[in-house]
Amino acid sequence: MSQLEDYVKTIETLKKEYREDITIFLALEMEYFPGIFEPTIEEIRQYPMDYLLLAQHFFYENESFHGTRFGWADEAHLKMYVELLTTALDTGYFNMVGHPDIMNYTGDDALYTKYMKQLADRLKQECIPIEINVNGFREGYNYPDKKFVKLGVENGNEFIVGVDAHNPDEYHDLASYKGCVKMAEDFGLSLIHI
């Protein structure tokens, strides 16, 4: 959190400098861990965030962290992931969810549909679009997951393509961006733009 104040000052300066050219939003991506959420959010609430993006890369179990992107075949971990995101959304602080389909569930398709439909329903209820993630597409990860996109389409969710650039060069990866747009178009989606 020591860099948060500098980050906010930088974004606020850039907002003023480029206000005639582009709209710049103040945003932060974070994970949700119940045991440390309150002190973390108290720090963040001091700043005028436009977007607070939930991106759950890990879950905490048996006193250790486990990556959500690594293959999980059991119902318990899938349920834990969806419940963790739902609990995070219950806080009312998050207005975006990054790669909600990051959970690499390799088990029964019916269970996947059961739990991920609950997540899609909640995102729809909160008016949070499902992200089609460019970084996952570029890296060949398990997301964006066509099963989840299809489920969201059938559920009537809105969608957005999120760049998720981890360095400035990735922002200019038009081939991966166009691949995600094509995926959306293949499902008959019209994307929202922020």
Describe the residue ranges of each PLM region.
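Domain-core and long-helix interface of multi-subunit machines
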Residues: 53-155
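Conserved small/polar residues in nucleotide/adenosyl-binding loops
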Residues: 192-194
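Helix C-cap/helix->beta junction micro-motif
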Residues: 18-20, 125-126, 155, 187
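Short acidic/histidine-rich active-site segments
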Residues: 157-172
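Residue-level marker for buried hydrophobic side chains located in beta-strands
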Residues: 26, 96, 159-161
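Acidic-and-aromatic substrate-binding clefts and catalytic sites of carbohydrate-active enzymes
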Residues: 31-37, 105-110, 137-144, 168-176
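A general structural detector for well-ordered alpha-helical segments in enzyme core domains, enriched
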Residues: 7-14, 39-43, 84, 115-119, ...
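A metal-dependent hydrolase metal-coordination microenvironment
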Residues: 1-76, 172
